[in-house]
Amino acid sequence: MGKFIGHFYPGLFLFSYGLYQATVVSKGMILKGCVLYPLCSPRNKQRCSRLWKISYGGLLKIVTGSLLTFYVVLCLDSGMVLMSKQVPSRFMYPKEWQHLTMFILLTLNGCVDFMSKNVLPQRCVGLEKGTLVLIIYQLLLLMVSHAKDSEGVELHVHSLLILVVFLLLLVLTAQLWAPNMCHLQLMETFLMLMMGSWLMQAGFILYRPVSGYPWQDDDISDIMFVTTFFCWHVMIDASFLLGIYGFSSFWYHCYSPSLKLTRPKEAPYYASTPGPLYKLLQEVEQSEKEDQAL
């Protein structure tokens, strides 16, 4: 897994999931948190609403995590051996086992999202966020130990990726107390895009450099340009997020005029029949007015 495919495809998934989250968050901000369903005919309304409520993000996590898990297991000719047969025995394939753990965690996170949205009688956002925080925390620990034997360009690339994961962990932890805050959702989406795009870039830097020549660990200019590329990714991903929001806002205001902001309807007012106490008070007030008139 420590190859181009092992960095590019997980990064592609994270970037695609970040784009999906960007569309969801943009729609939520434009509609001010309203739940919107696609327009459909009355006879197909129930079927369409069920399709709309499916946790596509959870399904994407399950499918991607399962495929990557099988890839890790099958990419080794000798199989996923935990301990060597030599004396004294040693652990085998530590990085592959770390990759396997990461992808299993991704699959479990998708299962939790799907169960919360489609299996439980009521969606439990706290369960989804808590599980995601726990998984990102474990991912951070795995990545810190994953970069222990790295040096030079590879160490710098992984250090910047660890920085993004750490910031994402802080944002997700804050969302446990404020899950509906738009600013935190935007930051989560942006960091997810950063994590995916930089992981794809890491595959090109470490295994398929565009110039055709490998990066030099002892060249300070290569280290500096890694940081420069990271800053470019920050600007590009921020532009992606801004562009998705702008396009969604333009599409809503120009091409979807029928999708109005749903405001809470006022409760109907019902005139209640006066009770005996109310009638008694009216009689007392009437008698007081007559006494004052006399």
PLM region spans:
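Transmembrane-helix exit/juxtamembrane "anchor" motif
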Residues: Y20-G33, F240-P264
